[in-house]
Amino acid sequence: MPREQKQVRELQEGSYVMMDSSPCKINHYSTAKPGKHGSAKARVEGKGVFDEKKRSLSQPVDAKVWVPIIQRKQGQVVSVSGDDAQVMDLDTYETFTMRIPEGEDFTSDDNIEYLEYEGQRKVVG
């Protein structure tokens, strides 16, 4: 699994973190000051990269969490069939099928950018 461990205090809005075994993009990050009996706490709110579900995480700032290493890749649309597109990776020349997001209109020979993590892929931009 391409991921690494970081302390919660090292996270920032816009970066990625694993929540409930799913990679999520951090939308909001806040900390509460340490009290008389305990350390500072951080609250992280994020949205699933591939499933769009909202998730939250509350941990001490010195706790360790997993951070996924999500790759941003380039591809070319080979063919379009309904809601699916046949895409060829421009680095490895591997072809695979991807779901076309609503509102997007792809044609053959379009270059696209997509995110990939553990076999899951999503078109961005």
Curated annotation (Swiss-Prot):
Matches recorded under Gene3D superfamilies: 2.30.30.30, Nucleic acid-binding proteins
Q: Which domain of life is it from?
A: Archaea
The cross-references to SUPFAM superfamilies, in alphabetical order and at most eight, read:
Nucleic acid-binding proteins (SSF50249), Translation proteins SH3-like domain (SSF50104)
Query: Key word Cytoplasm present in the record?
Result: yes
Where in or outside the cell is it found?
Answer: Cytoplasm
Q: Which PROSITE patterns match?
A: IF5A_HYPUSINE
Assign the protein's first listed, main location to one coarse class: cytoplasm
Assigned keywords, A-Z:
Cytoplasm, Hypusine, Initiation factor, Protein biosynthesis
Pfam families given in the database record: IF5A-like_N
UniProt cross-references to InterPro entries, sorted A to Z: IF5A-like, IF5A-like_N, NA-bd_OB-fold, Rib_uL2_dom2, Trans_elong_IF5A_hypusine_site, Transl_elong_IF5A_arc, Transl_elong_IF5A_C, Translation_prot_SH3-like_sf
Q: Name one GO cellular component term.
A: cytoplasm
Q: So what family is this one in?
A: Belongs to the eIF-5A family.
> What's this protein's name?
Translation initiation factor 5A
Which source organism does the UniProt entry give? Answer: Halorubrum lacusprofundi (strain ATCC 49239 / DSM 5036 / JCM 8891 / ACAM 34)
